Amino acid sequence: GLIERYQTIVKTNIKTAIGTDASHGEIADNAILMNKVMNDTVENAIKGITINGAELCGLEHLVGSITEGKYADIVACKGNVENNIELLKNVDFVMKDGKIYKDNH
């Protein structure tokens, strides 16, 4: 099924992106699913919701990483997601196009 196919993709190092047509906030759940159920690494799951999606859409010059000249769209979570990917659901800071919308620091 789907899990076995995705695990094959992970083993062959094919670049994947994670997206959703659902309302905001659910993209973290998709990354967590990829990490926990599909046995992907935390790094690949995070790249799947950031730079990989941008590259696969041809938008890496505008979004996908924190780089000078790109849109300042940043989401930060308290804690180390490498140790606990569930922390992606605990958003502490949000910046969109350089404007801060949430700051719990």
Tell where the protein language model's regions lie, with residue ranges.
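Short aromatic-centered micro-motifs
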Residues: V94
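Small/polar (Gly/Ser/Thr/Ala-rich) solvent-exposed segments
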Residues: N83
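His/Asp/Glu-enriched, well-ordered alpha-helical/loop segment
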Residues: G1-N80
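Short, small/polar residue-rich loop motifs at catalytic or cofactor-binding pockets
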Residues: L87-K89
